[in-house]
Amino acid sequence: MKILAAMSGGVDSSVAAARMVDAGHEVVGVHLALSAAPGTLRTGSRGCCSKEDAADARRVADMLGIPFYVWDFADRFKEDVIDDFVEAYAEGRTPNPCVKCNEKIKFAALADRAVALGFDAVATGHYARLQDGRLRRAVDADKDQSYVLGVLTPEQLRRAMFPVGDSPKPDIRAEAEQRGLLVANKPDSHDICFIPSGDTQAFLGARIGVRRGNVVDADGSVLATHAGVHEFTIGQRKGLGLVGPAADGRPRYVTSIDAETATVRVGTVEDLEIWEFGGEPVVWTSGRVPGQPIECQVQVRAHGSVVDAIVEPGAERIHVRLRTALRGVAPGQTVVLYRPDAEGDEVLGSAVITRD
């Protein structure tokens, strides 16, 4: 097969590319340039997609003896990931940019170009597994990335390969060391790659501006003012700007955000609990909408807790009823549905959470 190896410059994608070469495939490496302005993404020790990372990826490709290219997706990344991220926060939602990047960039824009150039599939360093077209959790539960891949359609999954999903992360590092790959001990990427400072609030404020509003309690009493709803997310406790402790002495958390009125409501930890929510749009990884309610498990954030639920399916929308209440569920987050079995949890589909 002719395989395009997406190489971030990290250890996982490097070993993934090496395994594709070992398997006898015709492999070409590509690094995605996602920033139009140099220095606006994290550097190699803190994240991905920097000039240093591109250089690391090129050196690994040279060691593997495969062609290597850098493809510029900066405009698509800004439009589909960064602008979407900013818009969501301005509307009081809490998005996951890694989910959006996989959906729109790595397995859409990149994969589309790969197919147009005659490649059969795109291989990445994601920790997940594909078995008979079914997306499953990785062997390494701590590194599992099936959550951020739960938005992929059947067509996208058919042209994807995850060569490291069957291995624990320590084994991947050991293999990289054994192969003599210079990235064997390179730190994992964390946080949001397009916010170099790590200050999400400042990043959003510079792009959204000031729209003052009130922080209120359950009965509508004003407790504080704020400069914009982008400063908050459901479940947030710190940085609320409250003038003093609540009468009962208990901490307060953000329980709802109304972007139209710029009102942020706070309450107790118990007020964060929810038992049901909606989700749209919906992706079913099999391409088929279940004909009846399904018993499954749901996860609402990367590496978050998993709870049992009953999901009423639909082609455009789902309704989730939880067996155990969850706290801090925010509109804009992605809910991923899993079916547990002996082969490893299977991803059934996903949706963007709505609270109505």
From Swiss-Prot:
One of its GO terms (cellular component) is cytoplasm. Keywords: ATP-binding, Cytoplasm, Disulfide bond, Nucleotide-binding, RNA-binding, Transferase, tRNA processing, tRNA-binding. Residues 143-145 are annotated as: Interaction with tRNA. Its EC number is 2.8.1.13. GO terms for biological process: tRNA wobble position uridine thiolation. ATP binds at A6, M7, S8, G9, G10, V11, D12, S13, L32, G125. Gene3D superfamilies: Adenine nucleotide alpha hydrolases-like domains (2.30.30.280), HUPs (3.40.50.620), Translation factors (2.40.30.10). Disulfide bonds join C101-C193. It is found in: Cytoplasm. The active site is at C101 (nucleophile), C193 (cysteine persulfide intermediate). It comes from the Bacteria. One of its GO terms (molecular function) is tRNA binding. It catalyses: S-sulfanyl-L-cysteinyl-[protein] + uridine(34) in tRNA + AH2 + ATP = 2-thiouridine(34) in tRNA + L-cysteinyl-[protein] + A + AMP + diphosphate + H(+). NCBIfam families: PRK00143.1, trmU. Catalyzes the 2-thiolation of uridine at the wobble position (U34) of tRNA, leading to the formation of s(2)U34. Belongs to the MnmA/TRMU family. This is tRNA-specific 2-thiouridylase MnmA. The lineage of its organism: Bacteria, Bacillati, Actinomycetota, Actinomycetes, Mycobacteriales.
